[in-house]
Amino acid sequence: MKYSTIILAFVVLFSCKNPEDEYHTPENALDAGREFIQQSLKGNFNTAGKYMLQDKDNQYWLDRFSKEFSSKSEHEKAQFSKASINISEVSDVVPDSVTVINFSNSFTKVPQKVKVVKHNGVWVVDFKYTFSGNL
C-alpha cells in the first residue's frame, strides 16, 4: 500500500504540466507571433522553437538568443518573464501568408519586429527576419 501511494504521488507530480508552456497550434499569424514572443520572454526556448520556421538560420538565431538570455541575471530573467507584450502594428505584407508584427515588451520597451509566415498551412515565425529585415 505504501509503495502504491508513492508511485501514485510520482505519477501525479510528473504528469502536471503548465498549460502556458505547452504548444498550441496557432489559429493565425498574431497567435503564432504572440506565443513565440511570450515563450522567449519566459526563457522557454524549446517551446518557442515550436512556433518557429525550422531551418538552420532560424535555429542559429534562437540558439544565440537562448545563450544570451541564459547569461542574464536571475533578476533580469524574472523581469522578462513578467513582461507583457505591447503590439504597436500588425502588417499583412502578403495577405494570408506573410505578416510582420511590430512590438516591444514592458521591461525593455525596445521596438522589435517578427515576421510570421504560413508554412504548410501552419503559422510560424521566421526568426531570422528579426535580424536581417529581409522579407
Outline where the language-model segments fall.
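Short, charged low-complexity linear motifs
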Residues: K2, N46-A48, F107-Q112
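C-terminal motif of bacterial Sec signal peptides marking the signal peptidase cleavage site
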Residues: V12-S15
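Bacterial lipoprotein signal-peptidase II cleavage site
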Residues: K17-H24
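Short solvent-exposed beta->alpha transition segments
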Residues: L30-D31, E35, S40-V94
